[in-house]
Amino acid sequence: MAPLTVDPTALDSAGNQVVTAGEGLGSVISTLSAALAGCAGMAGDDPAGASLGHSYDSSAAKLVEAMVATRNGLCGLGIGVRMSARNYSVAELQSNVGAGGGALPAPALPGPISAGRPPSAVGSSDSAPPGWGWVAPYLGMIWPTGDSAKLRVAATAWSAAGTQFGIGEIVGTGTPMGAIRAQQIPEGPAIDRAFADAYRSTTGVVQQCQQIAAQLTSYAAKIEKVHAAILDLLSRICDPLTGFKEV
């Protein structure tokens, strides 16, 4: 068995850095939520839009839950490391009776955050243009009621959140991981496994954020293409302002 070699102060500092990294992930979630707040109903309520919207709603809610769980887990890991540091400092103080200094204080516990459900993507965001009633019966299609601008805003928000979440976890835990691994303590392997779990969770979050962003961007492009084609057709047969059929 390897001898116990630990610097409680260094271990406590590393744990505090991990907590800070976790809290940073919370800020990423808050920024994402604020951006998505203005994107309600972005997919529309036509059949295609509603189908995509319901799928998005489910995926987005689960992904935010995963992000929150990763944030809370990382903060909890950091507090666990800090508690270990305190325990070692107490043991060190007790084994050196008469030595100066004192034990490290118990760390303050960061409160867990909860997952707020993103606003639904289903809803009417764009009404049909003047003159649509003239051509709709002949085209056999429905005017897409989604809002491509909102879809692109949401896509950008998800993409940015994924990138920032990944960078925040990797950069924020790199240095403290090195400091923790420098300590020869029994719980070292368990802490390593916890960091590996956090990394896997973060990687999954990043990938899913990019997938959602790509899905929203693709649907925005489809809406814009259909809208442009319909508006072009209407401009040929109707007054674009009144929608009255030209004869």
Regions found by a protein language model. Name each.
Residues M1-G243:
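N-terminal secretion-targeting helices of virulence/extracellular proteins
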Residues E246:
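Flexible nucleotide-interacting loop at or near the entrance of a catalytic core
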